[in-house]
Amino acid sequence: MLRVFEAFAGYGSQRLALIKANIPHEIVGISEIEGDVLLSYSAIHENLLEERNKNIKLTDDEMRDYLKNINIPLDYKTFENRADKLGGQKLKDMYIANKLNKNFGDIRSIDPKKLPDFDFFTYSFPCQDISVAGYQNGLVADSGTRSSLLWECCKIIEHKKPKYLMMENVKNLVGKNHKVNFNKFLLYLESLGYTNYWDILNARDFGIPQNRERVFCISILNPNEDFTFPQKQNLTLSMNDLLEENVSEKFYLKNNQVSDEPILQDYIYCLDSNYWKGTFLKDFLSKKRRQLVSGKVRPDGKYPARRLTPRETWRFMGVEDTNFDKASILVSNTSLYKQSGNSIVVPVLESLFKELFKSQ
């Protein structure tokens, strides 16, 4: 049984991939700070939708104290704790979710001596300060940027020495501005005895029709165990296969009959590298924004343009509708968009895990 710890867990795409790959495993703990994300994780993986109706003998202050102790939930931009702002069912949901998730909370506050043993450590650390579409503040150790949280993983890796590690982040991690820090981290892992294998994998090469390139780094502690990245697969799905047939009018742009010149295709698409969000077609045409919009082109060259629905964005990440449905009961559409954009494409992980754990 593979024992797994998910740092920067999100809604658990790694866990979904392990399940899809039929790899026996146990999640012994996670680290995640965002409240809505934790609700999604618990709804998908830990039966929160039923557990939330059970009685709790703790007072509101006792539940808040528990959350504060693991520094949850945090405002992702300011790292301000928001537990005092929770009340009623929202507070109860957050408390139950964190207990069910075995969430150790803010990675900066984790004492690795208090963590259970595990074989596999995943750490898809924040990309906002690395991404071309992000802030470009970098990931220098102790710089205080969100991407510099990568270095908080060192204490865990060094103390627990899991056999397998998996890092994931945007392609720009190995670009000219950040490659030096990426290499520095790899050298650190090598000093602990790890052998590192990294490559850039694209979602379209693993069954999902979107051009989403990400850096994956596999590190193995056993020097006698090799790793080869999975081979590319033929793409059989089209974008149309993942779109909903009947979409609410609220997803269509109000001033949507816009065109400067005809475009001779049935649909237009554009996929943001980090964050799913609707945009005006004018912005798309002027290339100011790179979000995905879709609309069937009329004969006169006009476009009834709309945003992708939250469900569609999760489909483009390889998440099944049943799991989306569980999460959507508890969190807003805005959060659902953000969660999918910050996650990892499940079929890519599935192929990678099948190769990594083929002897399991």
Swiss-Prot record:
Its EC number is 2.1.1.37. One of its GO terms (biological process) is DNA restriction-modification system. It is an enzyme of class 2 (transferase). It catalyses: a 2'-deoxycytidine in DNA + S-adenosyl-L-methionine = a 5-methyl-2'-deoxycytidine in DNA + S-adenosyl-L-homocysteine + H(+). Belongs to the class I-like SAM-binding methyltransferase superfamily. C5-methyltransferase family. Keywords: DNA-binding, Methyltransferase, Restriction system, S-adenosyl-L-methionine, Transferase. The keyword Nucleotide-binding does not apply. The ScrFI restriction system has two different methylases. Pfam families: DNA_methylase. The active site is at 127. PANTHER family: TRNA (CYTOSINE(38)-C(5))-METHYLTRANSFERASE. One of its GO terms (molecular function) is DNA binding. Residues 2-360 form the SAM-dependent MTase C5-type domain. This is Type II methyltransferase M2.ScrFI. It comes from the Bacteria.
